[in-house]
UniProtKB/Swiss-Prot annotation:
SUPFAM superfamilies: Enolase C-terminal domain-like, Enolase N-terminal domain-like. It holds the Pfam family MR_MLE_C. It comes from Salmonella enteritidis PT4 (strain P125109). Gene3D superfamilies: Enolase-like C-terminal domain, Enolase-like, N-terminal domain. It catalyses: (1R,6R)-6-hydroxy-2-succinyl-cyclohexa-2,4-diene-1-carboxylate = 2-succinylbenzoate + H2O. GO terms for biological process: menaquinone biosynthetic process. Belongs to the mandelate racemase/muconate lactonizing enzyme family. MenC type 1 subfamily. This is o-succinylbenzoate synthase. Keywords: Lyase, Magnesium, Menaquinone biosynthesis, Metal-binding. Its cofactor is a divalent metal cation. Its EC number is 4.2.1.113. Mg(2+) binds at D161, E190, D213.
Length: 320
C-alpha cells in the first residue's frame, strides 16, 4: 500500500552567502517521503536560486502532481531537474537501490587564511584537498591567495571555482601570480572563463587543469577527452534524476576524467544523501559537500559531527 507525505521548509542562512550577485537569506525547499508497505524513502527538492531553471513554487506544483500520480501507481519521473532528483532519491531509498555507505569527507571551503586551513586539514585522512572560490575579487588577489596557500602547505591540492567570472585577460592575471612550480597542485579550476573556448585556451597556455560544471547543463555539451580538461563537477540537484547522474559519472569515467559529486547548498538531509551517492558512484574521489556551515540548522537527518541544531520531521510544514 503506497502512501506519501510532502513537507515544505525554510532554513535561515549565514549573512554572507551570495550567489550570482544576490544574497541568499534563506534556503527554501521541499521533502518527499514515500512509503510502500514497511519501506520508506526520502528525497529533497531544493532548486538553487540563480542556478536552477525552476523556482521553488514551480517545483512544489510539479512534486505534488508527481506524488499524486505515484500514489495511483505511476512509475515515471518529473521533468524538472530538482524534482526528478528528489523523487528518484526517494524511490532509490524505498527500493534499496541507494546504498547506506557514505563518504562524509568533504573538501573544506577556504576563505584564504592559511592558518585556518592548516587546522582544518590536520584531521583530514588521506590527501589534503581544499576548495577556494575565485572570481569574486580581483584576479590578482585571487592568484596571490592561491599561491600563498600552496606555498604554506606543501602537500595541499586545491580545487578552484571561478563560475565563469573571468575574461581571458583576468584569467591570465590570476595565473601570473601562481608560481609555475605550484600549478600542478591545482587539482582543477572550474570554468575559469565565460566561454568554453576561452577556458580551453587558458588551460593550454598556463598548464592549469580545468573542470566543466555549468557546461554540463548546456544543450550542446558532449563528454570528450580534451587537453587540459581533468574533471567534471556534477551537481545532482541541477542535473536531474539519479539515473542521469549515473550516466554522467559513467561518461566521465569512460574518458578518464574525474567526476566530483557536488552540493547545490542542500539541507543536511540532502547532503547526507549526496555523501551516499558519492561513495557509491565516485568511490575514492572527495565530494564537494562542505556547505552545511552556511546554514543555521539541520533537518531530519544530521550530518555526522555537526553541532548545528537538527529539526525533526514534525517541526516541518506538511503539505500532504
Amino acid at each position: 500500500m503506497r502512501s506519501a507525505q510532502v513537507y515544505r521548509w525554510q532554513i535561515p542562512m549565514d549573512a554572507g552567502v551570495v550567489l550570482r550577485d544576490r544574497r541568499l537569506k534563506t534556503r527554501d525547499g521541499l521533502y518527499v517521503c514515500l512509503r510502500d508497505g514497511e519501506r520508506e524513502g526520502w528525497g529533497e527538492i531544493s532548486p538553487l536560486p540563480g542556478f536552477s531553471q525552476e523556482t521553488w513554487e514551480e517545483a512544489q506544483t510539479a512534486l505534488l502532481t508527481w506524488v499524486n500520480d505515484w500514489l495511483q501507481g505511476s512509475e515515471g519521473l518529473p521533468e524538472m531537474p530538482s524534482v526528478a532528483f528528489g523523487a528518484s532519491c526517494a524511490l532509490a531509498e524505498l527500493t534499496g537501490v541507494l546504498p547506506e555507505a557514505a563518504d562524509y569527507r568533504a573538501a573544506p571551503l577556504c576563505t584564504g587564511d592559511p592558518d585556518d586551513l592548516v587546522l582544518r586539514l590536520a584531521d583530514m585522512p588521506g590527501e589534503k584537498i581544499a576548495k577556494v572560490k575565485v572570481g569574486l575579487y580581483e584576479a590578482v588577489r585571487d592568484g596571490m591567495v592561491v599561491n600563498l596557500l600552496l606555498e604554506a602547505i606543501p602537500d595541499l591540492h586545491l580545487r578552484l571555482d571561478a563560475n565563469r567570472a573571468w575574461t581571458p585577460l583576468k584569467a591570465q592575471q590570476f595565473a601570473k601570480y601562481v608560481n609555475p612550480d605550484y600549478r600542478a597542485r591545482i587539482a582543477f579550476l572550474e570554468e575559469p572563463c565565460k566561454t568554453r573556448d576561452d577556458s580551453r585556451a587558458f588551460a593550454r597556455e598556463t598548464g592549469i587543469a580545468i573542470a566543466w560544471d555549468e557546461s554540463l547543463r548546456e544543450a550542446d555539451f558532449t563528454f570528450e577527452a580534451e587537453e587540459g580538461v581533468r574533471a567534471v563537477v556534477i551537481k545532482p540537484t541541477l542535473t536531474g534524476s539519479l539515473d542521469k547522474v549515473r550516466e554522467q559519472v559513467a561518461a566521465a569515467h569512460a574518458l578518464g576524467l574525474t567526476a566530483v559529486i557536488s552540493s547545490s547548498i542542500e539541507s543536511s538531509l540532502g547532503l547526507t544523501q549526496l555523501a551516499r551517492i558519492a561513495a557509491w558512484l565516485t568511490p575514492g574521489t572527495l565530494p564537494g559537500l562542505d556547505t552545511l556551515h552556511l546554514m543555521q540548522a539541520q533537518q531530519v537527518r544530521p550530518w555526522p559531527g555537526s553541532a548545528l541544531p537538527c529539526l525533526k520531521r514534525d517541526e516541518l510544514e506538511r503539505l500532504l
